Amino acid sequence: MVSMKRTLLTTALAAAMGLATGTASAQFNQFYFLGDSLTDAGVYGARFTVNPGLVWAQDLGNRYGLTVTPSTQGGIDYAQGGARVTQPSPLIPAGAPQRSVSVQIDELLHATPSLNPNAVYAVWIGANDIFVNVSAAGAGLLTAAQVQANITTAATDTLAQIARLRDAGAKRIMVFNLPDIGQTPLGKSTPTAPFSALSGLFNSTLQAGLASLHVDIIPMNMFGLFNEVIASPASFGLTNVTTPACTTPSALNCTTATLVAPNAGQTYAFADGVHPTPAAHQIIADYAAAIIEAPQKIGLLGEAPMQVEQANFRAIDGRMWSGLNTPRPQNKIDAYAVYDYGNFDHSNDTGGSDNTLNSIVAGVDMKISDQMLAGVAFGYTEDKGSFGNNGGGFKLDEATLTGYVGYGSGPWYVGASAGAGDLDFHNVRRTFALGAGSRTENGDTRGTHVMGRVFGGYWFNTSGTWIHGPFARLTYQEANVYAYSETGTSSSAMTFGRQKRESLMSSIGWQASGTFGSVRPFGRVTWEKDYNDDNRSVLAGLVSMPGNFSIPVFRTDDNYVLFNVGASADLGSKLIGFISVSATAAKDDGNYQAVTVGVRMPL
Protein backbone atom coordinates (compact mmCIF):
# COMPACT_ATOMS: atom_id res chain seq x y z
CA MET A 1 0.00 0.00 0.00
CA VAL A 2 1.18 3.54 -0.67
CA SER A 3 0.46 6.54 1.44
CA MET A 4 -0.72 10.07 1.05
CA LYS A 5 2.51 10.94 2.73
CA ARG A 6 5.33 8.60 3.49
CA THR A 7 4.67 8.86 7.20
CA LEU A 8 1.01 7.92 6.73
CA LEU A 9 1.69 4.88 4.60
CA THR A 10 1.97 2.64 7.62
CA THR A 11 -0.94 4.22 9.42
CA ALA A 12 -3.40 3.73 6.64
CA LEU A 13 -3.85 0.05 7.07
CA ALA A 14 -5.37 -0.67 10.47
CA ALA A 15 -3.66 -1.82 13.63
CA ALA A 16 -4.09 -4.89 15.74
CA MET A 17 -2.55 -7.55 17.86
CA GLY A 18 -2.12 -11.18 16.97
CA LEU A 19 -1.97 -14.66 18.47
CA ALA A 20 -1.03 -18.35 18.00
CA THR A 21 -2.98 -21.34 16.75
CA GLY A 22 -3.98 -24.81 17.89
CA THR A 23 -6.22 -27.60 16.64
CA ALA A 24 -9.87 -28.48 17.13
CA SER A 25 -12.93 -29.35 15.12
CA ALA A 26 -15.51 -26.80 14.15
CA GLN A 27 -19.00 -27.22 12.76
CA PHE A 28 -18.65 -25.12 9.63
CA ASN A 29 -17.12 -25.83 6.26
CA GLN A 30 -15.69 -22.58 4.91
CA PHE A 31 -14.45 -19.09 5.76
CA TYR A 32 -14.57 -15.84 3.81
CA PHE A 33 -12.56 -12.80 4.86
CA LEU A 34 -13.29 -9.12 4.18
CA GLY A 35 -11.33 -6.11 5.34
CA ASP A 36 -8.09 -4.20 5.00
CA SER A 37 -4.37 -4.81 5.43
CA LEU A 38 -4.84 -6.60 8.73
CA THR A 39 -6.51 -9.41 6.81
CA ASP A 40 -4.98 -9.00 3.33
CA ALA A 41 -3.39 -12.34 2.35
CA GLY A 42 -1.24 -10.84 -0.41
CA VAL A 43 -3.16 -8.72 -2.90
CA TYR A 44 0.01 -6.69 -3.57
CA GLY A 45 2.26 -9.75 -3.74
CA ALA A 46 3.38 -9.46 -0.12
CA ARG A 47 1.61 -9.04 3.20
CA PHE A 48 1.61 -6.24 5.77
CA THR A 49 3.74 -8.15 8.28
CA VAL A 50 7.22 -9.65 8.37
CA ASN A 51 7.26 -11.50 5.05
CA PRO A 52 6.96 -14.36 4.26
CA GLY A 53 4.96 -14.54 7.48
CA LEU A 54 1.20 -15.05 7.44
CA VAL A 55 -1.71 -12.89 8.54
CA TRP A 56 -4.24 -14.11 11.08
CA ALA A 57 -6.75 -15.23 8.44
CA GLN A 58 -4.19 -17.61 6.96
CA ASP A 59 -3.22 -18.92 10.40
CA LEU A 60 -6.86 -19.55 11.19
CA GLY A 61 -7.40 -21.25 7.84
CA ASN A 62 -4.43 -23.53 8.48
CA ARG A 63 -6.02 -24.58 11.74
CA TYR A 64 -9.02 -25.93 9.86
CA GLY A 65 -7.22 -27.28 6.82
CA LEU A 66 -8.09 -24.34 4.55
CA THR A 67 -5.70 -22.57 2.21
CA VAL A 68 -6.35 -18.82 2.44
CA THR A 69 -5.24 -16.81 -0.58
CA PRO A 70 -6.44 -13.48 -2.04
CA SER A 71 -9.71 -13.53 -3.95
CA THR A 72 -7.86 -11.81 -6.79
CA GLN A 73 -6.04 -15.14 -7.14
CA GLY A 74 -9.20 -17.22 -6.84
CA GLY A 75 -9.05 -17.50 -3.06
CA ILE A 76 -11.43 -16.84 -0.16
CA ASP A 77 -9.73 -13.72 1.27
CA TYR A 78 -11.30 -10.58 -0.25
CA ALA A 79 -9.46 -8.12 2.02
CA GLN A 80 -7.27 -5.43 0.47
CA GLY A 81 -4.67 -3.27 2.16
CA GLY A 82 -5.80 0.35 2.36
CA ALA A 83 -9.51 -0.44 2.04
CA ARG A 84 -12.17 1.64 3.76
CA VAL A 85 -15.75 0.68 4.53
CA THR A 86 -17.47 2.21 1.49
CA GLN A 87 -15.38 5.19 0.36
CA PRO A 88 -12.44 5.27 -2.07
CA SER A 89 -9.13 5.32 -0.24
CA PRO A 90 -6.06 7.45 -1.02
CA LEU A 91 -4.08 4.75 0.80
CA ILE A 92 -4.55 2.27 -2.03
CA PRO A 93 -1.67 2.42 -4.56
CA ALA A 94 -2.25 4.40 -7.72
CA GLY A 95 -3.58 2.17 -10.46
CA ALA A 96 -4.76 -0.54 -8.07
CA PRO A 97 -8.51 -1.25 -7.93
CA GLN A 98 -10.46 0.62 -5.27
CA ARG A 99 -11.91 -2.32 -3.33
CA SER A 100 -13.68 -1.04 -0.25
CA VAL A 101 -15.51 -3.63 1.88
CA SER A 102 -18.64 -2.68 -0.04
CA VAL A 103 -16.89 -3.60 -3.30
CA GLN A 104 -15.44 -6.75 -1.74
CA ILE A 105 -18.96 -7.89 -0.88
CA ASP A 106 -20.06 -7.05 -4.42
CA GLU A 107 -17.34 -9.37 -5.68
CA LEU A 108 -18.26 -12.10 -3.22
CA LEU A 109 -21.93 -11.94 -4.20
CA HIS A 110 -21.02 -11.95 -7.89
CA ALA A 111 -19.05 -15.16 -7.34
CA THR A 112 -21.63 -16.66 -4.96
CA PRO A 113 -25.02 -14.90 -5.19
CA SER A 114 -26.50 -17.15 -2.51
CA LEU A 115 -24.04 -17.36 0.36
CA ASN A 116 -23.14 -20.61 2.06
CA PRO A 117 -25.06 -20.68 5.38
CA ASN A 118 -22.52 -23.08 6.88
CA ALA A 119 -19.59 -20.74 6.30
CA VAL A 120 -18.19 -18.07 8.62
CA TYR A 121 -17.78 -14.55 7.17
CA ALA A 122 -15.18 -12.35 8.86
CA VAL A 123 -15.40 -8.53 8.68
CA TRP A 124 -12.60 -6.36 10.09
CA ILE A 125 -12.63 -2.78 8.80
CA GLY A 126 -12.60 0.86 9.90
CA ALA A 127 -9.01 1.75 10.75
CA ASN A 128 -8.29 3.31 7.37
CA ASP A 129 -11.36 5.53 7.68
CA ILE A 130 -9.80 6.85 10.87
CA PHE A 131 -6.38 7.34 9.28
CA VAL A 132 -7.78 9.20 6.25
CA ASN A 133 -9.94 11.49 8.39
CA VAL A 134 -7.16 12.25 10.87
CA SER A 135 -4.85 13.10 7.98
CA ALA A 136 -7.48 15.39 6.42
CA ALA A 137 -8.05 17.11 9.75
CA GLY A 138 -4.31 17.59 10.16
CA ALA A 139 -4.23 19.26 6.74
CA GLY A 140 -7.05 21.59 7.78
CA LEU A 141 -9.58 20.00 5.43
CA LEU A 142 -11.96 18.76 8.15
CA THR A 143 -13.07 19.97 11.55
CA ALA A 144 -13.07 17.75 14.61
CA ALA A 145 -16.87 17.55 14.46
CA GLN A 146 -16.76 16.49 10.81
CA VAL A 147 -14.21 13.79 11.60
CA GLN A 148 -16.41 12.42 14.37
CA ALA A 149 -19.43 12.44 12.09
CA ASN A 150 -17.48 10.64 9.37
CA ILE A 151 -16.29 7.93 11.76
CA THR A 152 -19.81 7.43 13.07
CA THR A 153 -20.96 7.07 9.47
CA ALA A 154 -18.17 4.56 8.77
CA ALA A 155 -19.33 2.41 11.68
CA THR A 156 -22.96 2.67 10.57
CA ASP A 157 -21.92 1.74 7.04
CA THR A 158 -20.10 -1.29 8.43
CA LEU A 159 -23.36 -2.45 9.99
CA ALA A 160 -25.07 -1.99 6.63
CA GLN A 161 -22.43 -4.12 4.92
CA ILE A 162 -22.87 -6.86 7.51
CA ALA A 163 -26.61 -6.70 6.84
CA ARG A 164 -25.90 -7.29 3.14
CA LEU A 165 -24.12 -10.51 4.02
CA ARG A 166 -27.04 -11.53 6.20
CA ASP A 167 -29.56 -10.80 3.46
CA ALA A 168 -27.57 -12.90 1.00
CA GLY A 169 -27.72 -15.95 3.26
CA ALA A 170 -24.82 -15.64 5.71
CA LYS A 171 -25.74 -17.11 9.10
CA ARG A 172 -22.56 -16.52 11.09
CA ILE A 173 -20.56 -13.32 10.76
CA MET A 174 -17.37 -12.70 12.68
CA VAL A 175 -17.20 -8.99 13.53
CA PHE A 176 -13.99 -7.38 14.80
CA ASN A 177 -13.95 -4.08 16.59
CA LEU A 178 -10.89 -1.84 16.30
CA PRO A 179 -7.89 -1.91 18.61
CA ASP A 180 -6.87 1.28 20.35
CA ILE A 181 -4.89 2.86 17.52
CA GLY A 182 -3.56 5.42 19.97
CA GLN A 183 -1.53 2.63 21.62
CA THR A 184 0.31 1.66 18.43
CA PRO A 185 3.84 2.95 17.78
CA LEU A 186 2.32 5.38 15.27
CA GLY A 187 -0.33 6.51 17.72
CA LYS A 188 2.21 7.09 20.47
CA SER A 189 4.44 9.03 18.11
CA THR A 190 1.56 11.46 17.37
CA PRO A 191 -0.03 11.95 20.80
CA THR A 192 -2.08 14.94 19.68
CA ALA A 193 -3.94 12.87 17.08
CA PRO A 194 -7.30 11.62 18.42
CA PHE A 195 -6.65 7.98 17.49
CA SER A 196 -7.83 6.54 20.80
CA ALA A 197 -11.01 8.63 20.92
CA LEU A 198 -11.92 7.78 17.33
CA SER A 199 -11.25 4.08 17.88
CA GLY A 200 -13.65 4.20 20.81
CA LEU A 201 -16.25 6.14 18.82
CA PHE A 202 -16.16 3.66 15.94
CA ASN A 203 -16.42 0.71 18.33
CA SER A 204 -19.27 2.11 20.40
CA THR A 205 -21.30 2.92 17.28
CA LEU A 206 -20.60 -0.48 15.74
CA GLN A 207 -21.38 -2.41 18.90
CA ALA A 208 -24.58 -0.49 19.57
CA GLY A 209 -25.99 -1.68 16.25
CA LEU A 210 -25.01 -5.35 16.33
CA ALA A 211 -28.15 -6.56 18.11
CA SER A 212 -30.41 -4.98 15.48
CA LEU A 213 -28.89 -7.13 12.72
CA HIS A 214 -30.74 -10.28 13.87
CA VAL A 215 -28.01 -12.63 12.72
CA ASP A 216 -25.43 -14.69 14.57
CA ILE A 217 -22.57 -12.30 15.37
CA ILE A 218 -19.30 -13.86 16.48
CA PRO A 219 -17.77 -10.89 18.32
CA MET A 220 -14.02 -10.33 18.30
CA ASN A 221 -12.90 -7.82 20.90
CA MET A 222 -9.65 -6.57 19.42
CA PHE A 223 -9.79 -3.43 21.56
CA GLY A 224 -9.67 -5.53 24.71
CA LEU A 225 -7.16 -8.06 23.42
CA PHE A 226 -4.85 -5.32 22.13
CA ASN A 227 -4.82 -3.59 25.52
CA GLU A 228 -4.10 -6.90 27.28
CA VAL A 229 -1.09 -7.50 25.02
CA ILE A 230 0.20 -3.98 25.65
CA ALA A 231 -0.26 -4.36 29.41
CA SER A 232 1.38 -7.79 29.70
CA PRO A 233 3.43 -8.73 26.64
CA ALA A 234 5.28 -11.53 28.42
CA SER A 235 1.98 -13.38 28.89
CA PHE A 236 1.85 -13.70 25.11
CA GLY A 237 5.51 -14.54 24.59
CA LEU A 238 6.40 -11.01 23.45
CA THR A 239 9.13 -8.68 24.63
CA ASN A 240 8.43 -5.45 22.73
CA VAL A 241 5.07 -3.72 22.22
CA THR A 242 6.29 -0.17 21.67
CA THR A 243 8.56 -0.09 18.62
CA PRO A 244 8.49 -1.71 15.16
CA ALA A 245 10.33 -4.93 14.35
CA CYS A 246 11.02 -3.79 10.77
CA THR A 247 13.58 -1.29 9.57
CA THR A 248 11.42 -0.51 6.51
CA PRO A 249 8.71 2.19 6.80
CA SER A 250 5.99 -0.24 5.72
CA ALA A 251 5.58 -3.87 6.70
CA LEU A 252 4.60 -4.56 3.09
CA ASN A 253 8.30 -4.25 2.22
CA CYS A 254 9.57 -5.98 5.35
CA THR A 255 11.23 -9.40 5.35
CA THR A 256 13.21 -11.42 7.84
CA ALA A 257 16.30 -9.73 6.36
CA THR A 258 15.12 -6.23 7.32
CA LEU A 259 14.44 -6.69 11.04
CA VAL A 260 15.94 -4.77 13.94
CA ALA A 261 16.91 -8.12 15.47
CA PRO A 262 16.97 -11.64 13.98
CA ASN A 263 13.96 -12.94 15.95
CA ALA A 264 11.99 -9.70 16.15
CA GLY A 265 9.15 -11.10 14.06
CA GLN A 266 8.43 -13.56 16.89
CA THR A 267 9.06 -11.31 19.88
CA TYR A 268 7.74 -7.90 18.76
CA ALA A 269 4.06 -7.04 18.54
CA PHE A 270 4.37 -4.55 15.67
CA ALA A 271 6.02 -5.02 12.32
CA ASP A 272 5.72 -1.28 11.53
CA GLY A 273 3.82 1.61 13.06
CA VAL A 274 0.48 -0.22 13.11
CA HIS A 275 0.69 -3.71 11.60
CA PRO A 276 1.13 -6.90 13.62
CA THR A 277 4.12 -9.19 13.31
CA PRO A 278 3.55 -12.87 12.44
CA ALA A 279 3.66 -13.61 16.17
CA ALA A 280 0.93 -11.07 16.81
CA HIS A 281 -1.17 -12.40 13.92
CA GLN A 282 -0.84 -15.83 15.52
CA ILE A 283 -2.33 -14.42 18.72
CA ILE A 284 -5.29 -13.02 16.79
CA ALA A 285 -5.89 -16.36 15.08
CA ASP A 286 -5.71 -18.24 18.40
CA TYR A 287 -8.11 -15.77 19.96
CA ALA A 288 -10.58 -16.14 17.10
CA ALA A 289 -10.38 -19.93 17.27
CA ALA A 290 -10.91 -19.91 21.04
CA ILE A 291 -14.13 -17.92 20.62
CA ILE A 292 -15.66 -19.92 17.79
CA GLU A 293 -14.72 -23.28 19.32
CA ALA A 294 -15.94 -22.46 22.83
CA PRO A 295 -19.58 -23.55 22.31
CA GLN A 296 -18.40 -26.99 21.24
CA LYS A 297 -16.48 -27.40 24.47
CA ILE A 298 -19.30 -26.15 26.66
CA GLY A 299 -21.76 -28.34 24.76
CA LEU A 300 -20.13 -31.35 26.41
CA LEU A 301 -21.67 -30.24 29.71
CA GLY A 302 -25.05 -31.29 28.34
CA GLU A 303 -23.78 -34.80 27.62
CA ALA A 304 -22.34 -35.42 31.09
CA PRO A 305 -25.67 -36.10 32.90
CA MET A 306 -26.46 -38.81 30.33
CA GLN A 307 -23.36 -40.63 31.54
CA VAL A 308 -24.37 -40.25 35.18
CA GLU A 309 -27.71 -41.96 34.58
CA GLN A 310 -25.93 -44.85 32.89
CA ALA A 311 -23.84 -45.26 36.04
CA ASN A 312 -26.97 -45.21 38.21
CA PHE A 313 -28.59 -47.85 36.04
CA ARG A 314 -25.53 -50.09 36.22
CA ALA A 315 -25.63 -49.87 40.01
CA ILE A 316 -29.33 -50.72 40.36
CA ASP A 317 -29.08 -53.30 37.59
CA GLY A 318 -26.22 -55.00 39.44
CA ARG A 319 -28.37 -55.15 42.55
CA MET A 320 -31.17 -56.79 40.51
CA TRP A 321 -28.81 -59.35 39.00
CA SER A 322 -27.69 -60.28 42.51
CA GLY A 323 -31.29 -61.15 43.39
CA LEU A 324 -31.74 -63.75 40.64
CA ASN A 325 -32.11 -67.30 41.97
CA THR A 326 -31.90 -66.03 45.56
CA PRO A 327 -35.35 -66.25 47.15
CA ARG A 328 -36.17 -63.59 49.70
CA PRO A 329 -39.04 -63.25 52.18
CA GLN A 330 -41.92 -60.87 51.68
CA ASN A 331 -42.04 -57.53 53.56
CA LYS A 332 -38.35 -57.68 54.42
CA ILE A 333 -36.03 -54.82 53.53
CA ASP A 334 -32.78 -55.39 51.71
CA ALA A 335 -30.10 -52.71 51.70
CA TYR A 336 -27.28 -52.39 49.20
CA ALA A 337 -24.31 -50.21 48.38
CA VAL A 338 -22.59 -49.95 45.02
CA TYR A 339 -19.46 -48.32 43.61
CA ASP A 340 -19.26 -47.71 39.86
CA TYR A 341 -16.29 -46.51 37.84
CA GLY A 342 -16.79 -45.40 34.25
CA ASN A 343 -14.52 -44.00 31.57
CA PHE A 344 -15.77 -42.36 28.37
CA ASP A 345 -13.07 -41.92 25.76
CA HIS A 346 -14.45 -39.76 22.99
CA SER A 347 -13.15 -39.57 19.45
CA ASN A 348 -11.46 -36.67 17.69
CA ASP A 349 -14.92 -35.22 17.01
CA THR A 350 -14.42 -33.54 20.39
CA GLY A 351 -10.66 -33.15 20.20
CA GLY A 352 -10.21 -36.42 22.09
CA SER A 353 -12.20 -35.41 25.16
CA ASP A 354 -12.49 -37.79 28.09
CA ASN A 355 -14.79 -38.33 31.06
CA THR A 356 -14.03 -40.26 34.23
CA LEU A 357 -16.94 -41.03 36.57
CA ASN A 358 -16.88 -42.26 40.15
CA SER A 359 -20.33 -43.08 41.52
CA ILE A 360 -21.66 -44.34 44.83
CA VAL A 361 -25.23 -45.62 45.03
CA ALA A 362 -27.00 -46.77 48.19
CA GLY A 363 -30.55 -48.07 48.31
CA VAL A 364 -33.17 -50.19 49.95
CA ASP A 365 -35.99 -52.25 48.51
CA MET A 366 -38.70 -54.60 49.66
CA LYS A 367 -40.65 -57.49 48.21
CA ILE A 368 -44.14 -56.18 48.90
CA SER A 369 -45.96 -59.16 47.42
CA ASP A 370 -45.14 -62.46 45.75
CA GLN A 371 -44.88 -60.67 42.41
CA MET A 372 -43.81 -57.11 43.26
CA LEU A 373 -40.66 -55.39 44.43
CA ALA A 374 -40.28 -51.67 45.20
CA GLY A 375 -37.28 -49.63 46.21
CA VAL A 376 -35.46 -46.34 46.31
CA ALA A 377 -31.82 -45.44 45.68
CA PHE A 378 -29.67 -42.41 46.36
CA GLY A 379 -26.66 -41.80 44.14
CA TYR A 380 -23.76 -39.40 44.06
CA THR A 381 -21.46 -39.09 41.05
CA GLU A 382 -18.32 -37.11 40.45
CA ASP A 383 -17.77 -36.72 36.70
CA LYS A 384 -14.44 -35.23 35.69
CA GLY A 385 -14.46 -34.15 32.07
CA SER A 386 -11.57 -33.13 29.85
CA PHE A 387 -12.07 -31.14 26.65
CA GLY A 388 -9.10 -32.77 24.94
CA ASN A 389 -5.96 -31.22 23.46
CA ASN A 390 -5.20 -29.74 26.90
CA GLY A 391 -8.20 -27.50 26.27
CA GLY A 392 -9.61 -27.46 29.79
CA GLY A 393 -12.45 -29.41 31.29
CA PHE A 394 -15.04 -29.44 34.05
CA LYS A 395 -16.23 -31.25 37.12
CA LEU A 396 -19.84 -32.31 37.58
CA ASP A 397 -21.17 -33.35 40.97
CA GLU A 398 -24.63 -34.85 40.66
CA ALA A 399 -26.83 -36.17 43.45
CA THR A 400 -29.71 -38.37 42.28
CA LEU A 401 -32.77 -39.95 43.83
CA THR A 402 -34.42 -42.86 42.02
CA GLY A 403 -37.53 -44.86 42.80
CA TYR A 404 -38.22 -48.17 41.10
CA VAL A 405 -40.75 -50.99 41.02
CA GLY A 406 -40.74 -54.43 39.43
CA TYR A 407 -43.42 -57.02 38.80
CA GLY A 408 -42.92 -60.66 37.83
CA SER A 409 -45.34 -63.41 36.94
CA GLY A 410 -43.77 -66.71 36.08
CA PRO A 411 -41.10 -66.18 33.41
CA TRP A 412 -42.36 -62.69 32.58
CA TYR A 413 -41.29 -59.53 34.33
CA VAL A 414 -41.70 -55.76 33.85
CA GLY A 415 -40.50 -52.76 35.76
CA ALA A 416 -40.18 -49.01 35.83
CA SER A 417 -38.09 -46.33 37.49
CA ALA A 418 -38.12 -42.56 37.77
CA GLY A 419 -35.60 -40.19 39.21
CA ALA A 420 -34.14 -36.72 39.34
CA GLY A 421 -30.73 -35.21 39.81
CA ASP A 422 -29.22 -31.88 40.82
CA LEU A 423 -26.38 -30.77 38.57
CA ASP A 424 -23.46 -28.81 40.02
CA PHE A 425 -20.89 -27.91 37.38
CA HIS A 426 -17.81 -26.24 38.75
CA ASN A 427 -14.28 -25.51 37.64
CA VAL A 428 -15.54 -25.30 34.07
CA ARG A 429 -12.44 -24.07 32.33
CA ARG A 430 -11.42 -23.33 28.77
CA THR A 431 -7.69 -23.35 28.18
CA PHE A 432 -6.30 -22.12 24.88
CA ALA A 433 -3.12 -20.79 23.34
CA LEU A 434 -2.61 -17.09 22.76
CA GLY A 435 0.60 -16.92 20.82
CA ALA A 436 3.44 -18.40 22.82
CA GLY A 437 1.34 -18.03 25.95
CA SER A 438 -1.94 -19.52 27.08
CA ARG A 439 -5.03 -18.50 28.99
CA THR A 440 -7.74 -20.19 31.02
CA GLU A 441 -11.26 -18.84 31.46
CA ASN A 442 -13.31 -20.24 34.34
CA GLY A 443 -16.97 -20.52 35.25
CA ASP A 444 -19.57 -22.45 37.23
CA THR A 445 -23.17 -23.34 36.61
CA ARG A 446 -25.94 -25.63 37.78
CA GLY A 447 -28.80 -27.54 36.25
CA THR A 448 -31.46 -30.21 36.61
CA HIS A 449 -31.79 -33.77 35.38
CA VAL A 450 -34.86 -36.01 35.19
CA MET A 451 -35.01 -39.57 33.98
CA GLY A 452 -37.44 -42.44 33.68
CA ARG A 453 -37.43 -45.93 32.21
CA VAL A 454 -39.58 -48.96 31.61
CA PHE A 455 -38.20 -52.41 30.99
CA GLY A 456 -39.21 -56.02 30.70
CA GLY A 457 -38.12 -59.47 29.69
CA TYR A 458 -38.75 -63.17 29.64
CA TRP A 459 -36.75 -66.08 31.07
CA PHE A 460 -36.35 -69.43 29.35
CA ASN A 461 -35.34 -72.14 31.80
CA THR A 462 -33.52 -74.60 29.56
CA SER A 463 -31.77 -76.49 32.34
CA GLY A 464 -31.42 -76.46 36.05
CA THR A 465 -28.30 -74.32 35.78
CA TRP A 466 -29.00 -71.59 33.23
CA ILE A 467 -31.82 -69.23 32.39
CA HIS A 468 -31.81 -66.87 29.43
CA GLY A 469 -34.15 -64.72 27.41
CA PRO A 470 -34.94 -61.43 25.67
CA PHE A 471 -34.64 -58.06 27.37
CA ALA A 472 -35.94 -54.62 26.40
CA ARG A 473 -35.65 -51.19 28.00
CA LEU A 474 -36.77 -47.67 27.07
CA THR A 475 -35.08 -44.77 28.89
CA TYR A 476 -35.96 -41.07 28.72
CA GLN A 477 -33.67 -38.36 30.05
CA GLU A 478 -33.77 -34.59 30.05
CA ALA A 479 -30.88 -32.49 31.29
CA ASN A 480 -31.02 -28.71 31.57
CA VAL A 481 -27.77 -26.81 32.04
CA TYR A 482 -28.35 -23.23 33.14
CA ALA A 483 -26.91 -20.23 31.30
CA TYR A 484 -23.81 -18.72 32.84
CA SER A 485 -20.98 -16.25 32.36
CA GLU A 486 -17.33 -16.90 32.93
CA THR A 487 -15.94 -15.10 35.92
CA GLY A 488 -13.30 -12.95 34.23
CA THR A 489 -13.63 -9.64 32.41
CA SER A 490 -10.92 -10.25 29.83
CA SER A 491 -11.44 -9.99 26.09
CA SER A 492 -11.92 -13.77 25.91
CA ALA A 493 -14.34 -14.26 28.83
CA MET A 494 -17.63 -15.56 27.48
CA THR A 495 -21.29 -16.11 28.23
CA PHE A 496 -23.16 -19.32 27.37
CA GLY A 497 -26.87 -19.88 27.00
CA ARG A 498 -29.06 -22.52 28.57
CA GLN A 499 -28.67 -26.03 27.22
CA LYS A 500 -31.31 -28.72 26.96
CA ARG A 501 -30.29 -32.27 26.16
CA GLU A 502 -32.95 -34.93 25.68
CA SER A 503 -32.48 -38.63 25.07
CA LEU A 504 -34.93 -41.44 24.32
CA MET A 505 -32.86 -44.61 24.32
CA SER A 506 -34.11 -48.09 23.47
CA SER A 507 -32.16 -51.18 24.52
CA ILE A 508 -33.01 -54.53 22.95
CA GLY A 509 -31.03 -57.69 23.51
CA TRP A 510 -30.52 -61.06 25.15
CA GLN A 511 -29.39 -62.00 28.62
CA ALA A 512 -28.48 -65.08 30.61
CA SER A 513 -27.74 -66.10 34.19
CA GLY A 514 -26.50 -69.30 35.76
CA THR A 515 -26.10 -70.88 39.17
CA PHE A 516 -22.98 -72.75 40.19
CA GLY A 517 -23.12 -73.33 43.89
CA SER A 518 -22.83 -69.95 45.61
CA VAL A 519 -21.69 -68.16 42.44
CA ARG A 520 -24.19 -66.82 39.89
CA PRO A 521 -22.67 -65.49 36.64
CA PHE A 522 -24.72 -63.27 34.36
CA GLY A 523 -24.40 -61.44 31.08
CA ARG A 524 -26.31 -59.29 28.63
CA VAL A 525 -25.77 -57.84 25.18
CA THR A 526 -28.03 -55.09 23.82
CA TRP A 527 -28.34 -52.87 20.81
CA GLU A 528 -28.66 -49.27 21.99
CA LYS A 529 -30.53 -46.72 19.87
CA ASP A 530 -31.17 -43.07 20.78
CA TYR A 531 -34.28 -41.73 19.03
CA ASN A 532 -33.93 -38.19 20.37
CA ASP A 533 -30.29 -37.41 19.69
CA ASP A 534 -31.12 -34.34 17.64
CA ASN A 535 -28.66 -31.66 16.59
CA ARG A 536 -28.01 -29.16 19.35
CA SER A 537 -26.45 -25.71 19.33
CA VAL A 538 -25.04 -23.68 22.19
CA LEU A 539 -25.54 -19.91 22.29
CA ALA A 540 -22.43 -17.94 23.17
CA GLY A 541 -21.09 -14.41 23.31
CA LEU A 542 -18.43 -12.27 24.94
CA VAL A 543 -18.71 -10.72 28.38
CA SER A 544 -17.01 -7.59 27.02
CA MET A 545 -18.76 -7.02 23.68
CA PRO A 546 -22.29 -7.37 22.26
CA GLY A 547 -23.16 -10.13 19.82
CA ASN A 548 -24.29 -13.73 20.22
CA PHE A 549 -23.91 -16.78 18.05
CA SER A 550 -24.81 -20.45 18.03
CA ILE A 551 -22.51 -23.26 16.95
CA PRO A 552 -23.68 -26.88 16.53
CA VAL A 553 -22.12 -29.04 19.22
CA PHE A 554 -21.00 -32.62 19.58
CA ARG A 555 -23.63 -35.20 18.73
CA THR A 556 -23.23 -38.68 20.20
CA ASP A 557 -23.48 -41.82 18.12
CA ASP A 558 -27.10 -43.00 18.30
CA ASN A 559 -26.39 -46.67 17.45
CA TYR A 560 -24.02 -48.98 19.27
CA VAL A 561 -23.70 -52.31 21.10
CA LEU A 562 -23.49 -52.61 24.90
CA PHE A 563 -22.02 -55.64 26.70
CA ASN A 564 -22.41 -56.43 30.39
CA VAL A 565 -20.94 -59.47 32.18
CA GLY A 566 -20.56 -60.21 35.86
CA ALA A 567 -21.37 -62.45 38.76
CA SER A 568 -22.88 -62.40 42.22
CA ALA A 569 -21.84 -64.63 45.09
CA ASP A 570 -22.75 -65.42 48.68
CA LEU A 571 -20.13 -63.86 50.92
CA GLY A 572 -21.61 -65.00 54.22
CA SER A 573 -24.82 -66.08 55.85
CA LYS A 574 -26.58 -62.88 54.73
CA LEU A 575 -24.15 -60.85 52.66
CA ILE A 576 -24.20 -61.07 48.86
CA GLY A 577 -21.58 -59.41 46.69
CA PHE A 578 -21.68 -58.66 42.99
CA ILE A 579 -19.38 -57.32 40.29
CA SER A 580 -19.87 -56.52 36.63
CA VAL A 581 -17.97 -55.09 33.69
CA SER A 582 -19.68 -53.06 30.95
CA ALA A 583 -18.31 -51.92 27.61
CA THR A 584 -19.56 -50.59 24.30
CA ALA A 585 -18.58 -51.50 20.76
CA ALA A 586 -19.19 -49.97 17.33
CA LYS A 587 -19.66 -46.54 18.91
CA ASP A 588 -18.32 -44.07 16.36
CA ASP A 589 -17.82 -41.20 18.79
CA GLY A 590 -15.70 -43.29 21.16
CA ASN A 591 -16.42 -46.21 23.45
CA TYR A 592 -16.79 -46.40 27.19
CA GLN A 593 -16.02 -48.99 29.83
CA ALA A 594 -17.27 -49.39 33.38
CA VAL A 595 -16.75 -51.58 36.44
CA THR A 596 -19.47 -51.99 39.06
CA VAL A 597 -18.95 -53.53 42.51
CA GLY A 598 -21.56 -53.86 45.26
CA VAL A 599 -22.91 -55.69 48.27
CA ARG A 600 -26.46 -56.47 49.40
CA MET A 601 -27.82 -57.74 52.69
CA PRO A 602 -31.19 -57.98 54.46
CA LEU A 603 -31.89 -55.68 57.37
Which residues does each PLM region occupy?
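Gram-negative bacterial Sec-dependent N-terminal signal peptides
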Residues: M1-A26, V405
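Ser/Thr-centric signal marking residues that sit
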Residues: T11, T277, T445
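Short loop/turn positions at the edges of beta-strands in beta-sheet-rich folds
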Residues: A20-T23, A311, I368, L571
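Membrane translocator/pore-forming domains, dominated by Gram-negative outer-membrane beta-barrels
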Residues: K332-L603
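A detector of low-complexity, intrinsically disordered, Ser/Thr/Gly/Pro/Ala-rich segments
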Residues: K5-L9, L19-T21, T67, N253, ...
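Conserved active-site regions of diverse hydrolases
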Residues: S3, S25-R328, Y341-S347
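Short, Φ-rich (hydrophobic/aromatic) sequence segments
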Residues: L13, M17, Q307-R319, W527, ...
